[in-house]
A protein has these predicted regions:
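N-terminal flexible/basic segments that precede or flank functional cores
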Residues: 1-90
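Recognition helices and adjacent regulatory flanks at domain boundaries
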Residues: 82, 101, 147-150
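Short, amphipathic alpha-helical "recognition" segments used to contact nucleic acids or chromatin
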Residues: 87-101
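Hydrophobic beta-strand residues in large extracellular and virion-surface proteins
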Residues: 94, 98, 108, 119, ...
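Short alpha-helical DNA-recognition segment
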Residues: 102-121
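Residue-level detection of the helix-turn-helix DNA-binding "recognition helix"
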Residues: 124-125
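DNA major-groove recognition helix of helix-turn-helix/homeodomain DNA-binding modules
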Residues: 131-148
């Protein structure tokens, strides 16, 4: 089984790709080197959407596909390499939990026991949470801390 590790350390199984999906992915790997970020994004979205919509996939299915995730990750890596973006870290995932699961930051803080001031500093990238503090806070809202391999 051949896998691709994305910037967030999540594996994408390449063996599930149809041959034409794999061919497009290989082409996109070459395209990302020669195109600027905006041109690459326009290119990959068009290419992936055209290929998968010909199979009758809905937009939601296209966006949820492995090929879409692969093409998107190539663009993210390109932006990081060129200094246009940064590598995501735990604070991005923490912010996703706050925004996606709670009505307000205050509600998140009440549920986790973190202070609003500390959360504000952490999400603004001025401070870090200690691992034991983060682990305990996440556990209170049904999450756990995991360690993932670095992407190459």
């Amino acid at each position: 089984m051949s896998t691709y590790l994305d910037l967030r350390g999540k594996s994408i199984d390449l063996s599930v790709l149809a041959p034409e999906d794999l061919l497009l992915f290989q082409q996109l790997q070459a395209d990302v080197v020669r195109l600027d970020s905006a041109a690459y994004r326009n290119h990959w979205v068009t290419q992936v959407s055209n290929l998968l919509s010909r199979r009758g996939l809905s937009k939601a299915a296209i966006v949820g596909s492995s090929l879409y995730r692969l093409a998107q990750d190539l663009g993210s890596r390109q932006q990081v390499q060129r200094g246009e973006a940064r590598v995501p870290d735990y604070r991005d995932e923490l912010e996703g939990i706050v925004l996606g699961q709670f009505k307000t930051r205050r509600a998140f803080c009440e549920a986790t026991g973190l202070s609003e001031d500390m959360l504000s500093h952490v999400l603004a990238r001025r401070k870090h949470l200690a691992i034991d503090t983060l682990t305990e806070a996440l556990g209170r809202v049904g999450y756990r801390l995991t360690i993932t391999p670095l992407s190459k």
